[in-house]
Structure formats: structure tokens, C-alpha cells
Amino acid sequence: MTDWLDEIEPGAPDAVAAFRGIEAGKFISVRREVRRRAGPGSAERVVAQLGAIAQALVAIVEALPEPAFAAPGGEGDWNVAEAIGHDADSRAGLAMAGALAATGKFPPEAPSVVPGIPGTRGLGREALVRRLGASQRIVERAGRSIAGHEEEPCPLEHPQVGRLRCGEWLLFAAVHDLMHLEQLHGIAEALRSEPGGGQPGASRRDGAEPGGSEPGGSEMGAREALRGEHGGGEPA
């Protein structure tokens, strides 16, 4: 059992419960947990859990040495800064999609989710911390709109995940956060174990983007199918 996941579980129990299905390579159990835990009255609770995860993301961003942000980020050919920026954009975009659907404002012409959009290249520590903070503020506003509408359908379409309900997208954003938090902990561990200029992230990769050919068996397939990447294609 992963130490970092155990540490965050008290503050984000629903997200961690769903994420553990990914660890076990059980895609169906992840969908089941998301559905079970994102029902009526869940939005406020899930927003708080997204806040706890955002704090954990900020903590690891603040702990990484500056050169790490240009190192391989464990996601295709992205660097660490791009992966973090992508996650910040994704959590905000998924929450916003649920809020738009909950309030009847989801634009009919909105594009589907576009997987594999990296964050802005070249951002440093302070900019990434600000980006994560801004994403959490969007999540909190979206959560207030989703509250009471958790079980309403959302037109957002993901090529691997399909469609989820408004409250389910909010929880899925937290699960997606944990995927990238896992990568960051792997990168931090690589830095600790390879003093003097190792390549953090090169030894801890979750595989190719959805549709890629990176090997990895059933667990890898679950990880790929569950990547709720939502950059560039989010409704506005």
C-alpha cells in the first residue's frame, strides 16, 4: 500500500477509494465507486476532498527542486511542469463541465474531451502553485452549482471514459488528480534515489496517452482508459 496514498486518504476518502481500483487494475470497480460516491449531496464533500488533494499537489510542487520542472514528467514526452499544468487545467475543466450541465448552460456545440493536452511549457514553481490555486477556486464555484444536481446527466464526452453525471465528473477530477500526484511522488523518489543529476520521472512512467502503445497489461489499460485529461477541449 502506497504511503502517500495512505497519508491523503483521511482528507480524500472517496477519491482514494476509486483510485485504488486503478491500482488493482479493476476498471469496473473504479466506475462503480465513482457512481456510488458521487450521488445526491456529494458535491460539497467532494469539493473539500479536491481541496485536500490540491494542497498535496502544492506541497510536492513546493518541495521539488527547480530543475525538476524541466525533467521528464512521466506522461508521454511532457516535462514535469507541463504535467502539473495539465492537471490544473483538467480539474478545473471537468468541474466546470459538470457545473455548466447542472445549470443548463452546457453549450450544444462544445467539443468532446481532447486527451493528451499538456500544460504551458516553461512555468516555474510559483506559477504552477498559482495555477493550482486558481483551479481549486474554479472547483469550489463549480461545486456550488453542482450541489443538488449531482445525478443530472452531463453531455461531456470522453473517448475512453464516456459520459458521467455532473457529480461524477467532479469526483473523477479528484481521481485524475491522484494519477498525477502518483507520478509526482515517483519523480520525487527518483530525485532522492539518484543524487547528482539523475533523470527524475524516467523510471516511473504510467505509460502512453490513451490510444498509445506503451506496454503494461490490464493495470496499464485501466490507467489509460481512466485518464480524464481535459485540456484544450473543455467547454467555455
Identify the role of each PLM range:
Residues 1-35, 70-113, 151-196, 236:
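Short, contiguous alpha-helical
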Residues 33-69:
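Short, contiguous, helix-prone interaction/anchoring segments in small proteins
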Residues 36-43, 118-122, 159-166:
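A short, mixed-charge helix-start or loop-turn motif at secondary-structure junctions
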Residues 39, 43, 50-53, 76-80, ...:
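Hydrophobic alpha-helical segments and helix-packing faces
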Residues 48-62, 97-99, 113-153, 170-171:
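Acidic/histidine-rich alpha-helical segments that form the ligand environment
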Residues 195-220, 225-233:
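Long, intrinsically disordered low-complexity tandem-repeat segments
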